[in-house]
């Protein structure tokens, strides 16, 4: 079976799963219907962030993202992620193979979801972001759609009590970065757009 089949199947399963485990409160969903390709840049609280985003991507768009290379050693993850074209990345270094794969996905007209912070927040607040998203957006000449998510950190505690929890998602309009700006300036613009949509306690260093 083709990877397209597996992606459509997984997309449907994720949408159903998120409806079961939480109550989604979404603002700005129309911005995800922006013509692809584009980048989605969001804060990173838990492993529930990627399925939350995937459940909201319109079926007309194809989404991919990155996963830490360590999960490639876990057979179920490797089999699934390879079939839906997840991009493996080596943490702690500039992974040029992964960067090339992200650019190739955008060139194919896909949507790529990334977290500018690079890793999950241990405090819940935004951490200092890296310049990767800004660099990719400039290189591929694609816009960035900022996304703010909170409440996902309560999914697992609620599931243990057999309760659904409230998950909030705010999606901002596409940002077209100014090519004259530095990557630092572009990263600040993206992160402040995310922070502006988050409740104050989640804004961290961008509060």
Question: Model regions: which residues?
Answer:
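Short, glycine/polar-rich helix-capping loops at beta-to-alpha or helix-loop-helix junctions
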Residues: 10, 72-77, 155-157, 164
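Catalytic core of membrane glycerolipid acyltransferases/transacylases, capturing the structured
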Residues: 6, 19, 32-93
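Short amphipathic alpha-helix with an adjacent loop that forms part of the alpha/beta core around
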Residues: 30-33, 103-104
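Short gly/ser/thr-rich secondary-structure transition/capping motifs
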Residues: 19-27, 93, 150-153
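N-terminal membrane-anchoring alpha-helices
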Residues: 1-23
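Short, basic, glycine/proline-bearing loop/turn elements
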Residues: 13-14, 83-89, 116-120
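Structural motif corresponding to alpha-helix initiation and N-cap regions
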Residues: 26, 74, 96-99
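Non-catalytic C-terminal accessory region of glycerolipid acyltransferases
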Residues: 1-6, 97-207
């Amino acid at each position: 079976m083709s990877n397209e089949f597996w992606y459509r199947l997984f997309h449907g399963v994720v949408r159903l799963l998120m409806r079961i485990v939480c109550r989604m409160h979404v603002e700005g969903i129309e911005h995800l219907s922006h013509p692809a390709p584009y980048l989605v840049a969001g804060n990173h609280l838990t492993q529930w962030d990627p399925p939350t985003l995937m459940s909201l991507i319109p079926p007309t768009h194809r989404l991919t993202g990155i996963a830490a290379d360590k999960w490639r050693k876990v057979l179920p993850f490797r089999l699934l992620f390879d079939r839906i074209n997840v991009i493996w990345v080596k943490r702690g270094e500039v992974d040029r193979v992964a960067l090339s794969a992200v650019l190739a996905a955008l060139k194919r007209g896909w949507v790529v979801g990334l977290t500018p912070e690079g890793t999950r927040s241990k405090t819940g607040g935004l951490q200092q972001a890296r310049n990767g998203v800004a660099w990719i957006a400039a290189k591929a000449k694609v816009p960035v759609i900022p996304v703010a998510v909170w409440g996902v950190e309560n999914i697992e505690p609620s599931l243990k009590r057999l309760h659904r929890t409230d998950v909030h998602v705010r999606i901002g309009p596409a940002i077209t970065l100014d090519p004259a700006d530095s990557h630092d300036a572009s990263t600040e613009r993206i992160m402040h757009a995310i922070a502006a949509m988050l409740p104050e306690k989640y804004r961290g260093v961008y509060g």
